[in-house]
Amino acid sequence: QIQRFIYAINQPYVRDGMQSAFTNVSVFDGPYLEALFGGSTFPDGTFMIDYIDEIKEFQKIFMEVTADIRSKNMMTFPVLTMSLLYQNGKFTDEEFARWAIEHNRKWNDSNIFCDSSVNSLSNCCRLKSNIEDLGYFNSIGGTALKVGSVKVSTINLARIALEHYNEKDY
């Protein structure tokens, strides 16, 4: 099913069938999952947080399947972000952080967002949103979370290389 999802979101249907929809997927360490889903229940009444290990394992499988698909096909989406809580000079969920960093070292396919509080989220655009004040939430998952490139500085290495005529100057 993960493969179907990846292929489906990469199908061109926006702008005259030439572009696929922009899609973000966030992956969370234990403290983020606890903050986001701590009091939430499944339809059968069980608490989501009781399945935190299974949720983390599913996220890892999702990331590995996505990376495997991308190793064989050029897939633009989803844009992936891993959110990790970093306090007092260390990751609070060290096992998950080690996995996330090792995964990204191998595949280089994710943005890694480290923060000292689980009250903020980030997605592909590196824009930090406060989850304590979502503003609104609707039945299809829409919220007032910010997306965009506010206060984002991007170093355009390709442009720097273009403007320098030899490797020494670059």
What is each of the regions a protein language model found here?
Residues Q1-Y170:
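Conserved catalytic cores of very large enzyme subunits
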